[in-house]
């Protein structure tokens, strides 16, 4: 059974998936494309890429699916349905990725675009360890972490109750290294959303 906090996230994105897609159209200075391009430049065509928290078929997932064998995972059934329609060439799985079990060395890259801020703190450490195991030696992790010291918050966002948590940047960096990754890039980036400034820590690391 999913953690009650991650189930809150599933229910939230079931309820406000289309609202969220429209909301993110208002981003100014969004770094996703630049970081994704960096990841793509390090992969061969046809590489196996796992997209954690893929949502309803984001532009990032769509671009990855143009060159790679993409498996998207999302906890929201409605978002997964939307993704399957939007990007039929990719494979999508509805699951709580904090509980996901996959064979070792299954992917050349794992990407997670501004999703780990929904992961309860105590679940992030084992998740990073499993991600390392899912990657082939030399595989890549691209992720954006929440960049604030947030033990856990549940409340309304975009019209639905959801959950957020996170560590400060220095802790995120340490946890990535402790999961036996070598960090290639590590930057805190601020961009504008319709709600105001957003601050996330972007990390590109090699297994």
PLM feature spans:
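Class I SAM-dependent methyltransferase SAM/SAH-binding core
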Residues: 50-99
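Short alpha-helix
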Residues: 164-180
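Short, glycine-/aromatic-enriched active-site segment of Class I SAM-dependent methyltransferases
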Residues: 146-163
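A short glycine-rich, Lys/Arg-flanked "PGG" loop and its adjoining helix->strand segment in the class I
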Residues: 125-137
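Conserved class I S-adenosyl-L-methionine
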Residues: 1-45, 149
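Core SAM-dependent methyltransferase catalytic element
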Residues: 192-207
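Conserved beta-strand signature within the Rossmann-like core of class I S-adenosyl-L-methionine
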Residues: 138-145
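A conserved beta-strand element that flanks and buttresses the S-adenosyl-L-methionine
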Residues: 111
């Amino acid at each position: 059974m999913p953690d009650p906090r991650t189930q809150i996230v599933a229910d939230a994105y079931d309820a406000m998936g289309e609202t969220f897609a429209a909301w993110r159209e208002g981003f100014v200075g969004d770094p996703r494309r630049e970081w994704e391009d960096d990841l793509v430049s390090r992969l061969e065509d046809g590489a196996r890429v796992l997209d954690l928290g893929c949502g309803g078929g984001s532009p990032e997932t769509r671009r990855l699916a143009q060159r790679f064998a993409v498996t998207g995972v999302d906890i929201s059934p409605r978002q997964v349905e939307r993704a399957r329609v939007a990007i039929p060439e990719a494979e999508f799985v509805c699951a709580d990725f904090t509980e996901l079990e996959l064979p070792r060395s299954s992917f050349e890259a794992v990407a997670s675009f501004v999703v780990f801020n929904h992961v309860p703190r105590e679940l992030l450490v084992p998740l990073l360890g499993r991600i390392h195991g899912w990657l082939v030696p030399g595989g890549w992790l691209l992720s954006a972490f929440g960049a604030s010291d947030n033990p856990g918050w549940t409340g309304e966002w975009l019209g639905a109750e959801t959950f957020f948590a996170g560590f400060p940047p220095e802790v995120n960096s340490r946890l990535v290294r402790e999961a036996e990754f070598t960090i290639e890039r590590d930057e805190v980036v601020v961009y504008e959303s319709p709600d105001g400034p957003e601050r996330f820590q972007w990390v590109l690391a090699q297994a």
